[in-house]
Amino acid sequence: MPSSFDLLGEMIGLLQTEQLTSSWACPLPNALTKRQDLWRALINQRPALPLSKDYLNLEDAYLDDWRASFVPVSVKDCQKTNYTSLFLYHGDIRYLAVDAIVNAANSELLGCFSPNHGCIDNAIHTFAGSRLRLACQAIMTEQGRKEAIGQAKLTSAYHLPASYIIHTVGPRITKGHHVSPIRADLLARCYRSSLDLAVKAGLTSLAFCSISTGEFGFPKKEAAQIAIKTVLKWQAEHPESKTLTTIFNTFTSEDKALYDTYLQKENNCE
């Protein structure tokens, strides 16, 4: 069985042969981490075009190795809150073994094309595997237009521990600008659409990232308040959805502190 180091070398070779990205001429690194970075840069930049069976077999083997390198996190491992149907998980959303995780997507729905970018869209697309971008391309081709803010789309999660990914596009807030009622409602719509889609698909566990608070600039405090208030209201309006467990995933200590505070009933944003 080839090592991850060797698999990366073979994948890089195949991707560079295509000459589809700006990194195609980079020399093959001798260090594992540098190979990982180069492979990720190549696959991040690659257009949503079919891939060879040889490449996909190598990627499957590499991402299977990645998947085996950690213990997935289930709902029972998540932090309980004062609400029986709401949980918190502080860490990497890629490690969650739930029915679906929510990806903060962009309007193209094809993932992040910036090499090795730190956004959640990049991380999810990279480690779910290249089939995810192709699946999203099929959705966008059928749809025939950019994805609207506040909608939701469902795909397989491929190599991630989760079964599915729900993709939603949140609103942008220009730095220094206040949150208008329209943008607040658009963010709330992301949560409602994702919950509606989860129920329609028969899912029983759904993990939300902090939608729009990264590259899209939505203030973290207001975003957390909107997220919690919207989910609680949706649950109250959908008593038949009691089987759906909702997890709020936080990645920064600031986000965790906000959700810890607002999920106490005396501070519940309602």
Curated annotation (Swiss-Prot):
It comes from the Bacteria. SMART domains: A1pp. Keywords: Glycosidase, Hydrolase, Metal-binding, Zinc. Zn(2+) binds at residues 112, 117, 119. Residues 73-267 form the Macro domain. This is Protein-ADP-ribose hydrolase. Its cofactor is Zn(2+). ADP-ribosylhydrolase that specifically reverses the SirTM-mediated mono-ADP-ribosylation at an asparatate residue of GcvH-L, by releasing ADP-ribose from the target protein. May play a role in the regulation of the response to host-induced oxidative stress. It catalyses: 4-O-(ADP-D-ribosyl)-L-aspartyl-[protein] + H2O = L-aspartyl-[protein] + ADP-D-ribose + H(+). GO terms for molecular function: poly(ADP-ribose) glycohydrolase activity. Pfam families: Macro (PF01661). Its EC number is 3.2.1.-. Belongs to the MacroD-type family. Zn-Macro subfamily. Binds 1 Zn(2+) ion per subunit.
